[in-house]
């Protein structure tokens, strides 16, 4: 494209998708509504997370976002539109090892089958003082995003929320 990475992401992804609250985590900038990040000691005490410069990994997780923007992004992975069907298949299809065993992971998306047979795709992220999970359930046109500002997994919370929505949607069918 000839553009630097951050300009490309802004011009070709964030602006076209309306991701108004997704920005690179510039540590030297004031970012409106940037949250504080926390950790937990072994005794359960909540403490401020240490400073981390995420700019070295912008392409692999150095952005700040909101659940709303994450859901908008996830909606583009439910079906063809912003991305071609072939691209979605490439991203979501689990890779296969040389021995034929599935990795359960595509390009950025883990793939799983729930007890009810619904296929899910998920992408998690974590840094010192925060964690995220973006969960897609294409059979129900459902996207759930969770963001927590403390080190540790967000998965349990997001999976519970998704299950509530799925149960409700299935009851309507």
List PLM regions with ranges:
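Short, surface-exposed loop or secondary-structure junction motifs
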Residues: 1-127
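Short, well-ordered loop/turn and helix-capping segments at boundaries between secondary-structure elements
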Residues: 19, 79, 97, 149-153, ...
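Non-catalytic surface loops within mature trypsin-like serine protease
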Residues: 21, 113, 138, 150-152
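Glycine-centered structural positions embedded in regular secondary structure
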Residues: 35, 108, 143, 157-158, ...
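A short local loop/turn or secondary-structure capping micro-motif enriched for an aromatic residue
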Residues: 56-57, 127-131, 152-155
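Short, gly/Ser/Thr-rich active-site loops of penicillin-recognizing serine hydrolases
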Residues: 114-118, 151-173
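Short, well-ordered beta-strand elements
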Residues: 131-150
